[in-house]
Amino acid sequence: MQQQGEPSVLSLRPGGGGGKSRLFVPRFSSSSSFDLTNGGSEETPFPVKRENSGERVRFSREEILQHRESVQVSDEILRRCKEIAVELFGEEQSWGNHAAESKITNHTQHRHTETDNRDWHSRSQIPTSGKEWLRDDPREAKSTWQGSGPTPVLIKAEVPWSAKRGALSDKDRVVKSVKGILNKLTPEKYELLKGQLIDAGITSADILKEVIQLIFENAILQPTFCEMYALLCFDINGQLPSFPSEEPGGKEITFKRVLLNNCQEAFEGAGKLKEEIRQMTNPDQEMERMDKEKMAKLRTLGNIRLIGELLKQKMVPEKIVHHIVQELLGDDTKACPAEGDVEALCQFFITIGKQLDDSPRSRGINDTYFGRLKELARHPQLELRLRFMVQNVVDLRANKWVPRREEVKAKKINEIHSEAERNLGMRPGAMASMRNNNNNRAAVSGAADGMGLGNILGRPGTGGMMPGMPGTRVMPMDEDGWEMARTRSMPRGNRQTVQQPRFQPPPAINKSLSVNSRLLPQGSGGLLNGGGRPSPLLQGNGSSSAPQASKPIPTVEKPQPRSQPQPQPQAAPLANSLNAGELERKTKSLLEEYFSIRLVDEALQCVEELKSPSYHPELVKETISLGLEKNPPLVEPIAKLLKHLISKNVLTSKDLGAGCLLYGSMLDDIGIDLPKAPNSFGEFLGELVSAKVLDFELVRDVLKKMEDEWFRKTVLNAVIKSVRECPSGQSVLDSQAVEVEACQSLL
């Protein structure tokens, strides 16, 4: 029971208020008056016992609805409820109205489907009494804000930003274009972007100076690319126009003169910048001083290297080089130069030392310079790090300017691949094959999975790319040319290459199984042998297997009679087949490399190294096949390569025609997997016919090799269309009208 003197406070939370650990709520009576705002009466309808003050007590809906009959609601609450009901349902409601209760129950279901046509802006304000309304209503706040007045007008800025405001001047347009070109400049894109830079629109001296400043800043801040930027300066020096001097009687403004002036100003301004850095002694300027020191060092070394690379391109005279060296060494032969000057001097000699030694006029002066460098290498006041740096330059000259480590410079992608192949011991062109032949490796992996081998055959190293990998084992061969596991009675030879394979294949491998040996990696036969049984899957695929074939090991399973002669293996056909396999592998490697770098001269050199004229028709067929498999088909690169090989007398027209016939005979099968192959093949033939390398007589022979009528029509239409697009195409069609009609008669 409640104690006397304690006022009863009603809380809307279940269990009432009071905050006591044990609270008994008296029952409501019908005669008691109840006012939510004044605290209500002393009786409540539900006695609830709360043992824990933090516990939340919940009532059911039926219990809460009992309040309606037992509570006397104040007039203020009834008025508020009516106003809310009018807002929600459009008519007056009461607590005792059961229709309103039904509307409240179904309001959630219909509120999204009903159309609200009421005027919310013109509704009357809710009158307030002396007692404040404690509930915050967001709808009320929103309507109050909306009815406060018109929306304030946005104030526009005097000079608003606009992406299209104003047109760029010619100077700004050219500078912006040159910035984009220099940001994309790489050794691979050099030729293309160089032409764009020349055609950028340099039509005045001011534009020329801005462009040179951009090139100069990019070069000195990227010392690794100084060689490329120096070559760019040399190439565009004669292509850009010169302009008259702004001063009367002055020299004309040329690219070379402005560039050398920039180099001179940067070299002479380094001293002023160092003096400014020395004056920054305030502790608060420590970070700024360190940043400026790094930037000054980077700009000095970059400028020195750029001047050296310009000397190699004959754009800087040697007298300027000697002046720079003498400035860096200083006039006092006994004094120690500054650390930054010594480091710049070493970088300068690494760049141009060989050129100075090769010049008869500069060789003697160079001896004097290096005599001074030898003294600096032993100078006690010089930092030990710089003494080692100077000694490395002296040793470099003694070694005929051949560095112990390769100099870091910008390289092309194919150069990086070649270097990786040399370092990893991979065959030439393996990197291009690994990058472009993902489909072939996936096929090999799938074949291996089907045999239960997992992905062991799909590894890049297993295919004989790297020497010493498991796929390069040399296994002995029996008289039939089958590989056998080595036994103790057999000579071991190289212990590293004939060790027993650790992998034991499943029993299904030793059963009758048909596997295409072209899909398996080179030298994979050693992985498939196990248990001393011969492997019927594939033979050795390397040049080292040929001597094994000439010395057969007699089988011991079934001895033969003495009267019957022992069959001797035919070594020559085996050698020829291995030679053909090796040629096919090298051909695919050189073609993949050509398709990635598009250098016909390198491809020409690789074809010449094959030294197999009889294989040239097959080479033409492989070129067409690999090129048309690409996406998109490489029609133009294929035609360009083959025309170049014919012009250099590496291929003959007969070889080219035979290769086209070989591919044409395969087109019925290829066209099923590559629907675009017939049209691409026709475009390729049209390129050669337009160049008068082939004629329509060969096209007719190629069409005869095809059985599919639709493929014939597609190829011929593509040939005629490609020839017509050539400037002299109509004359070619007129001169070979008879052959064209013969081709059309096959359709």
UniProtKB/Swiss-Prot annotation:
PROSITE patterns: MI (PS51366). InterPro entries: ARM-type_fold, Initiation_fac_eIF4g_MI, MIF4G-like_typ-3. Residues 28-41 have a biased composition (Polar residues). Gene3D superfamilies: 1.25.40.180. Disruption phenotype: Displays no resistance to potyvirus. Possesses reduced amounts of chlorophyll a and b. I4g1 and i4g2 double mutants show reduced germination rates, slow growth rates, moderate chlorosis, late flowering, impaired fertility and reduced long term seed viability. They also exhibit altered responses to dehydration, salinity, and heat stress. The i4g1 and i4g2 double mutant has reduced amounts of chlorophyll a and b. One of its GO terms (molecular function) is translation initiation factor activity. Plays a role in the accumulation of some potyvirus during viral infection. This is Eukaryotic translation initiation factor isoform 4G-2. The lineage of its organism: Eukaryota, Viridiplantae, Streptophyta, Embryophyta, Tracheophyta.
